[in-house]
Structure formats: C-alpha cells, structure tokens
Amino acid sequence: MLQGQIYRGVNETIESVVWISDLRRFTRMSDEFAPPVMLGILNDHFERVVGAIAAQGGEVLKFMGDSVLAIFPVDPELGARPASRAALAAGLVATEQAAAGPRARGEAGGDEIDFGIELHHGTVVYGNIGAPDRLDFTVIGPAVNQTARIEALCRTLDRQVLVSQRIAEGTDAELVSLGCQALRGVREPQEIFTLPEFA
C-alpha cells in the first residue's frame, strides 16, 4: 500500500478491519504512579499488543496516549474473512499475553493491567495527513469513527474484546452476541459481539 510514498495528501481508499485498544483506568494509574513508572507500564503493554498484531499480519499505525490504532487490510480477492479472523486471533493472543506477563500494577500494589479491544470492518482512507513539516500516517473515515464509538462500550459491557456486527456477519469465527447497543453518532442500534472467552 502506497509503496513507501510519504508526501502529504497521498492516500488510498482500502477495505480493512480496524483495531482500537486502550488501557482501562489509565487516568487513575497516571495519578498513582510517577511518569517514569507509567512509561514503563505503557512500553510493556504496547510491546505485547504490537507483537500480537504483527504476528497476524496487522499494521500498527499510531499510539494515542494509552491507545493503539491498527488495521488488518482486506485482500479484495479473499474477502474480509481472513482479515477478520486474523484480528480476532491477535485480540485473543494480546489478552492472553497481558494476563500471563508482568503485572506492573500488581507489583506496585495495585490491580493487574487491564485493557479493551474494539474491532470493526469497513472502508477507510489510508495515507498521510498533517502540516508540510510534520506528517502523520493514519487511517480516517466512518469505520474508524464507529470503532471508537464501540470503544466506549468496553467499560459499559465489561468485556475485554468487542466486535461489530459487520465483522460478525463476515466471519466464521464463534462469537457471542451482547445484544443491540446504541452508539453515539450512529442512527440505529448495532448488535455487538464478543469472543466466547469473554462472554
């Protein structure tokens, strides 16, 4: 994609599974721990998440505070199923590694690291945006916005992985419905799913 072009305005419209994940209780953790400790927690967390995404063929685009934005591009010849399956597998691995890894908060006397993952499938614009001397490589579009809306439900539904109806309709993976949920800015309620491991 884009073959390494880095000029502002260069972009490509692609179909992709969008991944957004973020730490829970990040604000409280930032108040409890000194900045160097928080940096260590974030780096350890990001290393595990990025490794899980990359192992399944995903591409991490950016870190936004405690959040990760990534995509699993859809091959037009294969359809969305392989990308959806890869994103779901990465989500499961990331949560397993977080549970088995060092518990930075536990070692400091608090709870273990907890984070949520949200997955949605749609069309995105993939490319460079920003000022002439400061470019940001990212994806934008309604699919990204809806993934962010689903992110807010992780705390409400108390599930670590949430999957959109669009992905559920295009995958053969086993998923569990959490019912129809209202998403801010989306006209109709959307059915949301999770993996059986988090039902």
Mark where each language-model region is:
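Juxtacatalytic helix/coil linker segments
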Residues: 1-60, 64, 109-111
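A structural signal for short, well-ordered beta-strand segments
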Residues: 18, 68, 115-121, 192
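Short acidic-rich active-site patches of cyclic nucleotide enzymes
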Residues: 24, 59-60, 64-76, 122-123
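Short, conserved catalytic or interaction motifs in soluble domains
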Residues: 28-31, 35, 58, 74, ...
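Helical mechanochemical/support elements of P-loop NTPase systems and associated helical scaffolds
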Residues: 38, 45, 64, 83, ...
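Alpha-helical scaffold within the catalytic cores of cyclic-nucleotide enzymes
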Residues: 43-57, 74-117, 142-153
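Catalytic strand-loop-helix junctions within cyclic-nucleotide turnover domains
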Residues: 71-82, 117-137, 154-157
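Cytosolic regulatory/linker segments at or just downstream of nucleotide-handling modules
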Residues: 124, 147, 153-199
